[in-house]
Amino acid sequence: GNNACVNIEALTKRLNISFSQSDDFKCRPLRVGDKNCLFAYLDGNIDKVLFEQDVVRPLKNAERLSSPYLENLQNTVAYSDEIKVVPIENAPGEIALCDIAFFIEDDDNAYIFSLRKPSTRAIGEPPTSSVMKGPREGFVEEIKTNTSMIRRRIKSPDLVMKSFQVGRYSATTVAVMYVRGIADENVVKTICEKIRKIDVDGVVDSA
């Protein structure tokens, strides 16, 4: 395309706007050789271990990334599936499908890696005892499991996730999810304000 001058910083801003600054949307810059690159994905929906070892690490260790990019990417990463190539403007739709988009400065394509996390549990078996007695991370992971299950059902960049820490002592993580353009913005604002004001530690016991 003609707008081949892709600036990673400007692209990061554009992507964050596409995802309404959703708290589970992550942009991760990476320098490969002399190129500024960027990964964008939804946290909680990708297999982080495979992502790190098969994609990020080989790229970090690569001396350079040159055109033809698709061919060079396929030769560099340890990812065996086909890397899908889409125009940059289609990237948010691919990210909303829980895939990872990779961008290279001065290239107007997005390279899509599918490293989706397998669903960890069915809805309806909340592991209450481990949440209450176990480590805090378990609880944060649980939130990610729940939000990722919703992401799998509503595959849209307009699905926004905002997370909060509530309770002065328990610092419980709470997530609000809504669809931009469908949910009433004022209602969302009111709900978020009410959650921010929660100061009582009433979430400690769920028995």
Where are these regions (language model features)?
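Membrane-embedded alpha-helical signal segments
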Residues: 1-207
